[in-house]
């Protein structure tokens, strides 16, 4: 009972800090992150409350809640199956070429380089069906978010008739 009470009070206080002093909360986020992630991974009741003040950091240094970030990237980072793809990098400097290629395509990238981030990613994907995290260096930039693209036919109908026997004879 005592641990549940303490957990609830901590979550309420963090929510209050987030709501009333967001810039100060963001400034302290890098120090708070591991404790909040650990709490979310180990205590379901804390996780329910913490989802409102858990922040994600983009490579530009801006902080977002999960809802804010997903709403921001939903239009450009949804694949052909309807999954919202959240791109992330664990080493911005070391994987700069991958980051720049993704940014050139108009994609937004999260910086997830903490000790518990891989566990948090699995947790978040298990709780949200239509969300997938993809590391920015896991594939070529064109395959990170698979869009349904149709190849335009560049042959005229006359050229198609000429080519048809060639392919049918194979």
Predicted regions and their residues:
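Conserved GHKL (Bergerat-fold) ATPase module
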Residues: 1-170
């Amino acid at each position: 009972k005592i641990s549940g009470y303490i957990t609830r009070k901590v979550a309420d206080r963090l929510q209050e800090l987030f709501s009333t002093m967001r810039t100060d909360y963001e400034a302290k986020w890098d120090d708070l992150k591991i404790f909040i992630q650990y709490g979310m991974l180990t205590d379901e009741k804390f996780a329910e409350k913490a989802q409102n003040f858990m922040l994600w950091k983009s490579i530009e240094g801006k902080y977002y809640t999960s809802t804010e970030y997903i709403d921001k990237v939903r239009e450009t980072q949804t694949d052909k199956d309807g999954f919202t793809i959240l791109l992330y990098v664990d080493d911005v400097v070391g994987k700069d070429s991958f980051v720049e290629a993704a940014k050139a395509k108009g994609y937004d990238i999260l910086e997830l380089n903490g000790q518990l981030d891989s566990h948090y990613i699995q947790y978040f994907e298990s709780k949200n069906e239509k969300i997938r995290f993809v590391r920015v260096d896991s594939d070529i930039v064109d395959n990170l978010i698979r869009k349904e693209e149709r190849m335009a036919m560049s042959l005229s109908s006359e050229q198609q008739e000429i080519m048809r026997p060639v392919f049918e004879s194979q």
